[in-house]
Design a protein with these regions (language model features):
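Conserved beta-strand in the GNAT
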Residues: 52, 60-69, 81
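Conserved beta-strand-loop-alpha-helix junction that forms the acyl-donor binding cleft
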Residues: 107-108, 113-124, 142-145
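A conserved beta-turn-beta hairpin within the catalytic core of GNAT-like acetyltransferases
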Residues: 71-82, 92, 110, 136
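Conserved acyl-CoA
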Residues: 88, 99-111, 133
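A short helix-loop-beta-strand connector motif used in the catalytic cores of GNAT acetyltransferases and
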Residues: 40-52, 81
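A short beta-loop-alpha structural element at the N-terminal edge
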Residues: 2-16
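Conserved glycine-rich acetyl-CoA-binding loop
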Residues: 75, 88-102, 118-125
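Conserved GNAT-fold acetyl-CoA-binding loop/helix
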Residues: 15-40
Length: 146
């Protein structure tokens, strides 16, 4: 399986993937602070982790899953929040997204949850193939610092 846990030496690649994903989604101004991201992923108190997909023989990172733990009080167990899933366009349709999600699924007996932008019909079809379902009746809120 070409999926592995990211290491501190991967920070430039991780940030590049996030920035590429932002451009893909139409946001061209995102530039991440590598030092801040390193602290959050690999510091004394990590807040998230990243899985990287590296196809055999490709010699490059093709995609990633950016995750953190969450907790379901109703299930009484931890799950995984998938904040970002991105496979570079030239590596799509080769099973890497499926392998990244399978690696997440293997890490928890709880739920794996994520958001997606409305209108992404390719993603809807992909997630349905996996057996994932939209959560009807819930609205996501965001409370940003002032």
């Amino acid at each position: 399986m070409p999926v592995r846990d990211a290491e501190v030496g991967d920070i430039d690649e991780i940030c590049a993937l996030i920035e590429e994903h932002a451009v893909y989604e139409g946001r061209h101004d995102l530039v991440l602070d590598r030092a801040e991201m390193t602290k959050h992923l690999f510091g004394a108190d990590p807040r998230a982790w990243v899985l990287l997909a590296e196809p055999p023989g490709a010699g490059t990172v093709a995609g990633f899953a950016f995750c953190c733990w969450n907790f379901s009080t109703w299930q009484g167990r931890p799950g995984i929040w998938l904040d970002d899933l991105f496979v570079r366009p030239e590596y799509r349709r080769h099973g890497l997204g499926r392998e990244l999600l399978a690696a997440l699924r293997a890490r928890t007996a709880g739920r794996v949850e994520w958001d997606m932008q409305e209108g992404n019909e390719k993603a809807v079809a992909f997630y349905a193939e996996l057996g994932a379902e939209p959560v009807h009746g819930w609205v996501r809120y965001r409370w940003s610092p002032s």
